Amino acid sequence: MAIIIPKVKTNGRIKMRIRKGDIIQVISGKDKGKIGEVLRTLPNENRLIVEGVNLRTRHVKPTSGGESGRIVTKEAYLHASNVMAYSTENKVASRIEIMVDSDGNRKRRLKKTGEILA
C-alpha cells in the first residue's frame, strides 16, 4: 500500500516537485503549449529554465580584441506555477504526486497517467 505525501510548506515556500531533466509543458504565458526539458531549477525562488522556452535576445557590444558585436538568444527563467509535468507517452500534462512504496522509497508519479518519473 503506497502512502501519498501532500505538499508541505517549509520556510514560507512550497517544495518544487519538478526536477532538472523533467519534460514539462508551459500552461500559461506567451509560450503556452510549448514542451521542453528543464535545464536548471532555482527552488528558493520557485523558478526554472526550460530548453527552448521563454527566449530572450541580448545585444552584445564588440570587445576591444577585434571581435564584432553579436545578438545572443538564451532561455530566461519561468515561474514553476506556469508549468506542468508532461507525459511523452500519453501526450498529456499532469500534476506530480509523491508516493512512498512498501519499502519506504519515495517516488514521483504523474497523477493522470500513473507514470513513474525517474
Swiss-Prot record:
Q: Which domain of life is it from?
A: Eukaryota
Entry keyword annotation includes rRNA-binding: yes
**Keyword RNA-binding belongs to the record:** yes
Q: Name one Pfam family in it.
A: ribosomal_L24
What is its biological role? One of two assembly initiator proteins, it binds directly to the 5'-end of the 23S rRNA, where it nucleates assembly of the 50S subunit.
The places in or outside the cell where this protein is found are:
Plastid, Organellar chromatophore
- GO MF, any single term: rRNA binding
Q: Which Gene Ontology cellular-component terms appear in the entry?
A: organellar chromatophore; plastid; ribonucleoprotein complex; ribosome
Instruction: Enumerate the PROSITE patterns for this protein.
Output: RIBOSOMAL_L24
The entry sums up its family as follows: Belongs to the universal ribosomal protein uL24 family.
The record ties this protein, via InterPro entries, to: KOW, Rib_uL2_dom2, Ribosomal_uL24, Ribosomal_uL24_CS, Ribosomal_uL24_KOW, Translation_prot_SH3-like_sf
Q: How does it assemble?
A: Part of the 50S ribosomal subunit.
Q: Name one GO biological process term.
A: translation
PANTHER family in the record: MITOCHONDRIAL RIBOSOMAL PROTEIN L24 (PTHR12903)
Q: What is this protein called?
A: Large ribosomal subunit protein uL24c
Q: Which UniProt keywords apply?
A: Organellar chromatophore, Plastid, Ribonucleoprotein, Ribosomal protein, RNA-binding, rRNA-binding
Classify the main location.
Answer: plastid
